[in-house]
């Protein structure tokens, strides 16, 4: 398997994935569930198809639910363990803890490669960038706005946290080497009552650099958004 695609999948799972255990309807034991969600209507989102391929075709994609949501998921123990093991070395401790809790509460043992003392393989900068691209494909924003002489551009990723800067955002800032970490900020939105942190790049040069670094591993949706933002920003400059 391509380790860059696995690193991308791990980043995407950090952004959009979840793992838990729940009681089974037909017996007293608990079962694990791993899922990744994406909005979509007419067709399965490309990002879910890519994730499915990156984890070796394990799990299933279903939807749309209520005509707006698809998800990849697996409840099979073998597939759960295999997907967890594939992504483990690129996951943050927060996501590892979620997978570990789901496994332990279901009465299962962690795969040896996922043991706390397991050594991580050497991590290439290219796989770090692939992870960031996956995370950005899931949670990122890029856009340009304004008018001639008053143009702005922004590339950002927001995350909620109860206490400190999320390790995911710290990793993004470290790998890309541009932009700033900001927060915490209390949001007015009803959907999130937790303080919000954000990694953000507002300088055109920083945004252009970050896009160039991630381009090889970004999905088509974020590529199109990035291209549109950069071109719009430049067009507003020419019109000034």
Predicted segments, located by residue:
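Internal intein/HINT superfamily modules and their associated LAGLIDADG
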Residues: 1-240
């Amino acid at each position: 398997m391509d380790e860059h695609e696995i690193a991308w999948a791990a980043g995407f799972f950090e952004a959009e994935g979840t793992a838990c255990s729940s009681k089974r309807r037909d017996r007293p034991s608990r079962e694990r569930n791993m899922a990744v969600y994406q909005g979509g209507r007419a067709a399965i989102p490309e990002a879910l198809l890519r994730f499915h391929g990156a984890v070796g075709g394990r799990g299933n994609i279903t939807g749309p639910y209520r005509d707006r949501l698809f998800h990849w998921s697996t409840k099979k123990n073998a597939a759960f363990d295999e997907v967890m093991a594939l992504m483990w070395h690129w996951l943050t401790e927060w996501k590892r803890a979620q997978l570990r809790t789901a496994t332990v509460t279901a009465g299962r043992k962690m795969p040896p490669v996922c043991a706390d003392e397991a050594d991580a393989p050497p991590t290439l900068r290219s796989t770090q960038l692939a992870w960031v691209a996956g995370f950005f494909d899931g949670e990122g924003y890029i856009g340009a706005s304004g008018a001639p002489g008053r143009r702005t551009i922004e590339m950002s990723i927001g995350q909620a946290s109860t206490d400190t800067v999320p390790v995911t955002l710290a990793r993004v800032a470290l790998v890309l080497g541009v932009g700033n970490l900001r927060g915490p900020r209390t949001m007015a939105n009803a959907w999130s009552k937790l303080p919000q942190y954000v990694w953000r790049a507002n300088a055109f040069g920083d945004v252009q650099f970050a896009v160039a670094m991630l381009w090889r591993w970004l999905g088509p949706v974020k590529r199109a958004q990035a291209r549109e933002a950069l071109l719009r920003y430049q067009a507003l400059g020419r019109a000034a």
